Amino acid sequence: MAKKKFVENTNWKKIDTDNQLIFEQGGFLGLEEIDPNDYFLTDKNVDKIEKQQKQKQKQEQEQEQKPTNKLTTKSTTKSTPVQNKNQKPVDKKRKSKKGNDDSDNEYSGYQDDSDQDDEYSAAKKKPRIIKPTETVDMGTELLNSFVEGTVHNKKKQRKGIKVKQIIDDNDNDFEDEEEEVKPQQKLQKQKQQEQKQKQPQKQPQQPNKKNNKKELQKEEEEQMEEEKEEEEVQQEEEEEKEIKKPIKEKKVKTQKQIEAAKKNINKLEKIKKRKEISEQKTISKEEQDQLDMSEWNSYNLDPLILKGLRSLGFSKPTEIQSSVIPVAVSSGYDVIGAAQTGSGKTLAFGIPMVQRILQHLRKHGQNVENKANKQQNDNDDENEDVEEEEEEEEEEGRSKEYRKLFSLVICPTRELAIQVTNHIKSIISHTNLKVISIVGGMASQRQQRVLSKRPEIVVATPGRLWELITEGHQHLVELESLLCLGIDEADRMVEQGHFAELESILKTLPIHRTAMSKKERLKKKETEEKRNKRRKVDKLNDKGEMIKGDQDDMDDQIPDEEMEELEQEEQNHLTTTHKRQTFVFSATLVNIPGDGAPTSQKKKYRKLTPIENLIEKVRFQRDYKLIDVTQKRLTAKNLLETKIFCNLEEKDMYLYYFVERYPGRTLVFVNSIDCARRLIPIFNILEVPVFALHAQMQQKQRLKNLDRFRTLDNVVLIATDVAARGLDIPLVQHVIHYQVPRTTQLYIHRSGRTARSDQDGISVVLVTPKERPLYIKLDSSIEHDIGNFPTDIRYMEGVRDRIELAKEIDKLSHQSLKDNREKSWFKKQAEEMDIELDGDFFGENSDDEQSEDTRIAEQKKQFKLKQLRAQLKHLLSRSLLPRGVSQSYITASAIQELESKSQSSAATDFSNKAKNVIGKKAKQLAIENHSKFLTKNKKK
């Protein structure tokens, strides 16, 4: 018996113990199983060791008092030698005692029982009798005793380790416990395998013979006990695995559920943000109580509509609303309206529609109030993939007969349809009416499911609407109860070659029974034209001679076949008892100079304009009123219109100058998708936050880019004319016409994206010499001057360097991408055709000079690309300063200039320049007047 020697080490804590190490058959007792954490830090470990020492002393005292005669007699009765075994039989008393210690101390099965078990095993150990003539191999004997001792201690201490693991097993360090248990289990399996392999070596060859049957029986019993013990250990290990498996699975499941829940929460937050942006924001109840709604009371609107307007904070109607609502609500006329962009046209036809639906439902005793006063969630949210669950129960007091399609609104673009839906939804928040949008680019199955909820108002684009009508959806086919029809941006809908489905949709709409048929109108028109032609109208020419009217009327007669087609069309048409109310609106509907006017005064009969053709196709069932609130100035009053004359190569420079010089929400319009695709990578290389919006993009991506443009502060959106009409994007400070718009209507609609709702805005037109004739036409049709935008030439040198580098980088990267695409295409085609391509094709595995040249050229290209990117990165890291100003040597004048530039905006710079120009002109006039006055005095 030897005491433990202590070695001084600064990294380990000295612990004084009376622990004894037994180098007999027990092997190196306890060294492998000591927890290294017990040697680190602290007072807790010292307290544990003191408790262990006290427990050892008590156990030693108890063992001394117990009689040990039975153990000695058992060990001495055997006369014959016994073979060495790997493990000793387990005593039942020892097991029960061990179980009690496990409950008292967390390290009980690990250190405390070790000394006790060693004493017990030493007492139970059978003495080995060696004859003088017998030879013994000490190496094998020592090896066998060492293995027996280590294995024996391992088995004894397993339960202590398990107790420790169960106590330390909690939610916070569950994963650490798994990592500790796994290597221990592997070691146990390895040692068991080694044990089985070494078992035949443990029996030294001896010439002893077993003649006694009792001894054989005892040996068999010992073997049986050992086998049972091994089985118990295996069962315990299996139980541990079974216990831990479900815990692991549950943990994994909960982690997955947590991740899914986090994703859903993020999606819901995005939905809320987008809804707040897209929908009209409501005000607080205190602000609602302070609002004066007296101007709305004169229109006799439903109180639920007034509640919705109050919650939005609309205390008074706009000009177009005050002109349309009395005519549509009180008098019941159809309306053809024209107003500037951002003037409230959507609610101008939305309020009369909702008013008529509510009147119809109240007249038939139906419930229209939303008792919960919650906003509708039935709209298929086009901005997200997450579907909102809807209640399938019908509203209280509403029968199925009165849950039909009462109002239909047709819009040219998907984004405009979604915007109109949100505007109408905001005023019906206190009713139980439903409004949805049906647009392309979304799953038709989902939209069919939303239509099955039978919404009263549908806002749609012509393509998807006609698709669902032809499929025979019940809610869109049953149009007998249609009360209102709205067409927004009508001039866009009647453009040649666009929206062919609109005419088919208008033909499917029901006709009022008492209304005049198309056949009758044509007959009446024909008779009037014949009467006018037969009448001799006298006219005077320039010379004063009399001219008679034309009497030829054969060309204007309608053939019989056309009359038969009209009769069949009238028979196939749906009829209704309701007189449908129609609203046709646009910003450039009427009063555009040159549109629809005759080319010469000599022509007696002018050709019908597209709008007049639309009016014929719509089949107004009431008398209509034409309401035009557009002013002589077709754009908004608070819009500053400017221009920049430049060369084609300088357009990118001026665009980057404007974006870098005046940060904010900038909307750039181009005439083609190719132009947008060319600009996007250049501005991405220049690290400008830029997004695209054009017709060839997927609807989901278009909506995402629009939402990003709405949420970010300093951002650029490069768009085609898809974004020119109807979109209400808040706080757009700048609109840049990168290419001159082809028509005046496009210019007005593009410029109308800024300076909305009494906010300031500026539009800039970039004009090249080639586009100058188109700009002259635009300038003459607008009938007011467009000023020159002030540009600081000192900044242009730095802008030019950045643009040239970005263009060169884009060119090289685009060429490499193009080559890679071609190679990948050839590879794909070769794989499909089971053809092997030569290595020369790709410049690989070839000694040809051309292939080496191509490799060298490619390496040079890549090196040059890296160089250019490094140069551009260096330029972008520095602020854009005017020529003559240095970052190293800052002067007082430079500081003042930088402060004024940082605080200025495009509008202020333009207004300051205009003031300076006016001041110069005033000075010149004053000097001229003064000189004239002096000359007069001299003459006198």
Swiss-Prot record:
Molecular-function GO terms, alphabetical: ATP binding; ATP hydrolysis activity; RNA binding; RNA helicase activity
Cited InterPro entries: DEAD/DEAH_box_helicase_dom, DEAD_box_RNA_helicase, Helicase_ATP-bd, Helicase_C-like, P-loop_NTPase, RNA_helicase_DEAD_Q_motif
Organism: Dictyostelium discoideum
One Pfam family per UniProt: Helicase_C
Domain Helicase C-terminal: 650-797
Reported function: ATP-dependent RNA helicase.
Gene3D superfamilies the record matches: P-loop containing nucleotide triphosphate hydrolases
One GO CC annotation: nucleolus
Domain Helicase ATP-binding: 326-607
Family: Belongs to the DEAD box helicase family. DDX24/MAK5 subfamily.
Record's protein name: ATP-dependent RNA helicase ddx24
UniProt biased composition (Low complexity): 68-81, 198-209
Biased composition (Polar residues): 367-376
UniProt cross-references to CDD domains, sorted A to Z: DEADc_DDX24, SF2_C_DEAD
EC class: hydrolase
EC number of this enzyme: 3.6.4.13
